[in-house]
Regions:
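Glycosyltransferase donor-sugar binding loop
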Residues: 44, 146, 199-213, 229-230
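A short, active-site helix/loop in glycosyltransferases that binds the activated sugar's phosphate group
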Residues: 114-139, 143-149
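Short hydrophobic beta-strand element within catalytic cores of glycosyltransferases
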Residues: 269-272
Length: 347
């Protein structure tokens, strides 16, 4: 029997959160390469149930996506079953949990118990190694890729009938504080007098009640902006195709945002916050545009709204970047090589 892999994730499809999208893409790619695996979604099953099912599955390796949310159970299972543990370190892990007084001890125990630790970008690995230098030899960089494989059409007009000729700014993100969803509204409101064709689209679940309610209250008075709800990932390519500028306003990212990668792959112009995770993908003025604050957002948004040629040039450069540097095959090869160093896997 081929060596099996048990994947533990804080979220999995049909969730459209970044972790779920990443896990689904990697699991699909590894399965296509002949790696037997099963994914457990910790958001829908009790830990005791997951533990019993994983033990019955008899895996040769446990792979946890998210050190804090999935790593603790994965570490306990790896020790109980005497098998290696692989941990994929996420944005929340790197930017918050590793330094949080309450969560850091548990996160560090998980990292120290892992046979391999994967990160999406070298900068995240450097951050981990600065805190836990003994882990550097176990760190492996596996860059993310794009998995827009299902192209179901999205009837945007059914959610928000838009006139022709609009310039659609899209924020595809779960509504929570780290995504800073309120940031675009004031600058775009000021620009809407110069560019009445501007429309602002929010697409994603309302995960934080406080932020979600504040956003909906604000949108109620803005006829040019709307939250269209959660869009299934299978329809994301269609939504991107109906947008002109894709926003990422995050305060932090775990190396590479799925939303930015997908926007680049779709040939959309990207306007993103100037943070480490976004800089790993967006070369300012080449593959997208970066902003440092609300004032700079307004300047860059005006440039993009008024210059379709600029949007086209940025989109084409982004599409070429993803095709050249972030193919799906490299991501899947990376995880397969990590596994191969620990257990027998198909060539």
């Amino acid at each position: 029997m081929a060596a099996r892999v048990a994947m533990l994730a804080p979220f999995a499809p049909p969730s459209v959160r970044g972790n779920a999208v990443t896990v689904a893409r990697i699991a699909r790619g590894l399965t296509e390469r002949g790696v037997p695996l099963r994914v457990w979604d910790l958001s829908v099953r009790p830990e005791a149930t997951v533990a019993a099912e994983v033990e019955a599955y008899r895996p040769a390796l446990v792979h946890a996506f998210h050190a804090h949310r999935a790593g603790r159970l994965a570490l306990a299972l790896a020790r109980r079953l005497e098998i290696p543990l692989v941990v994929t370190f996420t944005g929340t892990d790197a930017n918050h949990d590793l330094f949080d007084a309450e969560r850091a001890p548990a996160v560090r125990r998980v990292l120290e118990g892992a046979a391999r630790l994967t990160v999406f970008h070298a900068s995240i690995g450097d951050r981990v190694a600065a805190v836990l230098p003994d882990l550097r030899a176990r760190l492996v960089v596996v860059p993310q890729s794009v998995g827009l494989v299902a192209h179901e059409p999205l009837d945007l007009r059914a959610r928000w009938p838009l006139p022709s000729g609009v310039v659609a700014f899209l924020l595809p993100a779960a509504i929570r504080p780290v995504k800073d969803p309120m940031l675009p509204l004031a600058p775009l409101e000021r620009l809407s007098t110069r560019f009445p064709e501007i429309r602002m689209i929010y697409a994603g679940p309302l995960l934080d009640p406080g932020v979600g309610e504040a956003l909906l209250r604000r949108l109620a008075s803005l006829p040019w902006a709307r939250h269209i709800g959660t869009v299934p990932h299978a329809q994301m390519a269609s939504l991107l195709a109906q947008s002109d500028v894709v926003l990422n306003c995050s305060l932090s990212e775990g190396g590479m945002a799925n939303s930015v990668l997908e926007a680049l792959a779709a040939g959309r112009a990207v306007l993103a916050s100037d943070i480490e995770g976004n800089r790993s993908l967006v070369e300012n003025g080449v593959t997208g545009v970066l902003f440092r604050d609300e004032a700079e957002f307004e300047v860059r948004a005006a440039e993009l709204a008024g210059d379709p040629g600029l949007r086209e040039r940025l989109g084409q450069a982004g599409r070429e970047l993803v095709a050249r540097d972030y193919p799906l095959s490299r991501e899947i090869d990376g995880y397969r090589d990590v596994y191969r160093a620990l257990i027998p896997v198909p060539a």
